[in-house]
Amino acid sequence: MKHLLKAGALVALACIVTLTAGAQAHAAKRINIRLAHPMAPGNNVTVGYEKFKELVAEKSNGRVRIQLFGNCMLGSDRVTMEAAQRGTLEMASSSSPNMANFSKQWMVFDLPYITSPEHQQKLYKAIDDGELGKKLDEIAASIGLKPIMYSEYGYRNFVTTKKPIKTADDLKNLKVRTTDSPIEVAVAAALGMAPTPISWGETYTALQQGTVDGEGNTFSLLNDAKHTEVLKYAIDSAHNYSMHLLMMNKAYYDSLPANVQQILTEAGREALTYQRSITSELEKKAEDAFIEQGITVTRLSPEERAKLVERTRPVWDKFKDDIPAELIKLVQETQQ
C-alpha cells in the first residue's frame, strides 16, 4: 500500500513538474517588442502602427506582442531612434528629415520638390520592390538599424499663426519651426524665412508662445496634434515628401528566430499597404477640418508654385556632396 501511495505521489509530482515546465517554456517563447513613435492618436502613422501590432499578434498567434508608446511618450523621434540604435529599445519611428542625424543620405527626400504626389505609386513600387528600397535598407544597416516599415507620412505644407500666406513672397521673414534636417533649414532660409529647429513635442508651445510664427507639416498631423487651435493660415506648398521610418535594432532583429523575422516583415508590408490606402482620405479630411476651424487654406497657382521650386533649387547644389548622386538618381527615376 505504501509503495502504491509513493508511486501515485511520484506520478502526481511528475505531472506538476511537466505542466510547470511547459508553462515556463511557453512563457519563455513569448516575445515583447516595444515600439516608440512621436505621432498623435488618429494620425495615419499611428493607425499604421496599430495595424502592424494587430497583424503581428495575429500571425504569431499571440506569441509576439508589440507594445506601442506613441505621442512622444518615451521621447522625441531622435531620442527614441538613438535608443533603438544603442539597443536599449527594440523599435523606434522617426521622420525622414530627423534621420539626417544618423546618416546624411536620408536627406535625399528632404530635397525640395524631388518628388511629386502625382508620381506617388511609382515611388512606392521603387521603395517596396526596387533598387531604391535596397539602397535604403543598406543605409539603415550601416547605422545598426533594420527597416520594418517605410511608413507613409505625406507632403509638408507651410502654415502660420498670424501672417496671411498666399504667395511665395508672403513666406519672407517668418520665424518657422523646422526639424534638425540641414536641408529643411536651408529650404526655409532660401525662401527668406528664419528657420528655428525645435523638437516636435515642443512645437505646439512654441507656436502658442510666439517663439515661431509657423511650421511645415502635413495637414493630417497638424490637425491630429491640435495645432489647428493656434494656426490661422496655410498654403498647399507640398515642398517635400516625408516618410516615418519604423526601424528595429539590427542586432536584435538578427537574434530573432527566422519565423519571427518573417512575421515582422510580412506584417510591416501589409500594414504599410493599409496605411497608404487611407492616407489620402485622412489628409483630405484634415484639410476640411482646417477650413471648418476657420483656417484659411490657399491653393497655390502654378506660377507661385514655380517660384517656390525655383527659389529652393539652389539647395540641391549646396548638399550635392552629402547625398550620393546614385541615390538622387534612383529617386528621380520614380518621377518620370
UniProtKB/Swiss-Prot annotation:
Instruction: Identify the keywords attached in UniProt to this record, alphabetized.
Output: Periplasm, Signal, Transport
The record's statement on gene disruption is: Cells lacking this gene lose the ability to grow with isethionate as the terminal electron acceptor.
Write down the chemical reaction(s) this protein catalyses: 2-hydroxyethane-1-sulfonate(out) + Na(+)(out) = 2-hydroxyethane-1-sulfonate(in) + Na(+)(in)
Which SUPFAM superfamilies does the annotation name? Periplasmic binding protein-like II
A Gene Ontology biological process in which this protein takes part is: transmembrane transport
Query: Can you name a GO cellular component term?
Result: outer membrane-bounded periplasmic space
| Gene3D superfamilies documented for this protein | Bacterial extracellular solute-binding protein, family 7
Q: What turns on expression?
A: Highly up-regulated in the presence of isethionate.
Signal sequence residues:
1-23
Question: Where does this polypeptide localize?
Answer: Periplasm
Query: How does this chain assemble?
Result: The complex comprises the periplasmic solute receptor protein DctP, and the fused transmembrane protein DctMQ.
Please give the NCBIfam families that the UniProt record associates with this protein.
Answer: dctP (TIGR00787), TRAP_S1 (NF037995)
> Can you tell me which family this protein belongs to?
Belongs to the bacterial solute-binding protein 7 family.
Protein name in UniProt? Isethionate-binding periplasmic protein DctP
